[in-house]
Amino acid sequence: MSRIGRLPIAIPNGVTVTVSPENVVTVKGPKGELTKTMHPNIDIAIEENSVIVTRKNDEKQNRSLHGLTRSLVNNMVVGVTEGYEKKLELVGVGYRAQLQGKKLVLNLGFSHPVEIEAKEGVEFQLDGTNKITVKGIDKELVGAVASDIRSWRKPEPYKGKGIKYENEAIRRKEGKTGKK
């Protein structure tokens, strides 16, 4: 048995989990609703106040899908109760962020400002002009949007300029030493 997959997922109060015969898992909670189609070789059962994930047989693919499916369902339950957020920092002279409605506008040293539309289920918050918070209930979507924002200007190793995650450590390099 998978160490992760065999653990039951506790369903908190105010959260409902339903599984259709086609293995479509729907989780409803105070922050919203998430739906995801799971692999057909994995069985998902709801017993009392917990979700139990089992696999049909011990094929290698099913063993790897077992823990994955349990983690995906758990992420859905946590998402609709607490939500997820990723924090980004803009480091560099003239690097700024501002909100225009649901749109995030970044000045990153290009000849034009970069505009990023908020996808469905994701919202942006600003703390000053150089800290961005991406919030949502879908962990995968929040991470993808934060990664898209970061990809506009990844931190460079010499001065550390760019967009970095809040707790990310940038490996710094030394510049040229010059002739003596």
Curated annotation (Swiss-Prot):
SUPFAM superfamilies cross-referenced by the UniProt entry: Ribosomal protein L6
Molecular functions (GO terms): rRNA binding; structural constituent of ribosome
PROSITE patterns assigned: RIBOSOMAL_L6_1 (PS00525)
Domain of life: Bacteria
Chaperone recorded as keyword: no
Keywords, ordered alphabetically: Ribonucleoprotein, Ribosomal protein, RNA-binding, rRNA-binding
Keyword flag Acyltransferase: no
Gene Ontology CC entries for this record: cytosolic large ribosomal subunit
InterPro entries: Ribosomal_uL6-like, Ribosomal_uL6-like_a/b-dom_sf, Ribosomal_uL6_a/b-dom, Ribosomal_uL6_bac-type, Ribosomal_uL6_CS
Name of one Pfam family that matches: Ribosomal_L6
Subunit comment: Part of the 50S ribosomal subunit.
UniProt cross-references to PANTHER family, sorted A to Z: 60S/50S RIBOSOMAL PROTEIN L6/L9, LARGE RIBOSOMAL SUBUNIT PROTEIN UL6M
Job of this protein: This protein binds to the 23S rRNA, and is important in its secondary structure. It is located near the subunit interface in the base of the L7/L12 stalk, and near the tRNA binding site of the peptidyltransferase center.
Protein name, as recorded: Large ribosomal subunit protein uL6
